């Protein structure tokens, strides 16, 4: 019981030792005894108010948990980067895989820093639209990066050239991912579900998004990039299990 009450908000407080502490406790005890009848009379006269006070006191005694960031044991975090995506998949104590980098370098850098990520085992750019790749420099500056993976459909061409230039400048090897490929990095295992062909209908870059079925710890996540109806139809025909989490544009 003592341990439980010690965990409630305000359950412990500084208290003077020795005679001063004893005198203070005695004074408080006398005050409670002298006001006890007045409190009882007040409760009888205003029962609703008295009940409200009791309920408020009871609620304050419920132990609370302090919210911290990052959450203990986090596995997958979707960064707030505004328009676009940046998903962090944990691979180790201070390492992760970044799937897309959003449009804003400071936003993705801040997200990774708050998660304590100093090493990116890989960066996967699902497709090459600006809202998924323009933040790349913020993710890779000042961090160890193992490899950069992109879709085999290198459109738009200017975004592809921008990504290539950043990779060369930072000495990061670049590869492409297609359906059937697999990534096993630390605590993460991922299977590539798409693209398996170039789809001319709809948005070619969107439908060429790298789709990852990710498992890290006990969490399954399906990261869809920006696939549209045509690629989604192909994906549904090939999907074999339901993930715990689905990320979609």
Predicted regions, residues:
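Non-globular, low-confidence helical/coil segments that flank catalytic cores
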Residues: 2-249
């Amino acid at each position: 019981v003592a341990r439980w009450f010690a965990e409630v908000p305000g359950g412990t407080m500084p208290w003077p030792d020795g005679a001063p502490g004893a005198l203070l406790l005695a004074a408080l005890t006398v005050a409670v005894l002298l006001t006890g009848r007045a409190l009882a009379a007040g409760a009888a006269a205003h029962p609703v108010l008295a009940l409200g006070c009791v309920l408020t006191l009871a609620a304050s005694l419920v132990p609370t948990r302090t919210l911290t960031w990052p959450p203990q044991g986090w596995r997958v975090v979707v960064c707030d980067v505004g328009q676009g995506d940046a998903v962090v998949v944990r691979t180790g104590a201070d390492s992760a895989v970044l799937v897309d980098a959003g449009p804003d370098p400071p936003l993705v850098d801040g997200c990774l820093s708050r998660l304590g990520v100093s090493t990116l085992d890989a960066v996967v750019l699902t497709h090459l639209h600006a809202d998924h790749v323009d933040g790349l420099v913020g993710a890779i500056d000042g961090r160890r990066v193992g490899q950069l993976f992109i879709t085999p459909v290198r459109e738009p061409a200017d975004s592809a050239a921008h990504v290539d230039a950043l990779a060369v400048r930072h000495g990061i090897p670049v590869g492409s991912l297609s359906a059937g490929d697999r990534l096993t990095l630390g605590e993460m295992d991922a299977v590539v579900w798409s693209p398996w062909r170039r789809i001319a209908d709809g948005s070619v870059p969107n439908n060429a998004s790298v789709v990852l079925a990710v498992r890290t710890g006990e969490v399954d996540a399906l990261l869809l990039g920006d696939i549209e109806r045509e690629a989604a139809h192909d994906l549904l025909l090939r999907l074999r299990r339901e993930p715990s989490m689905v990320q979609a544009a």
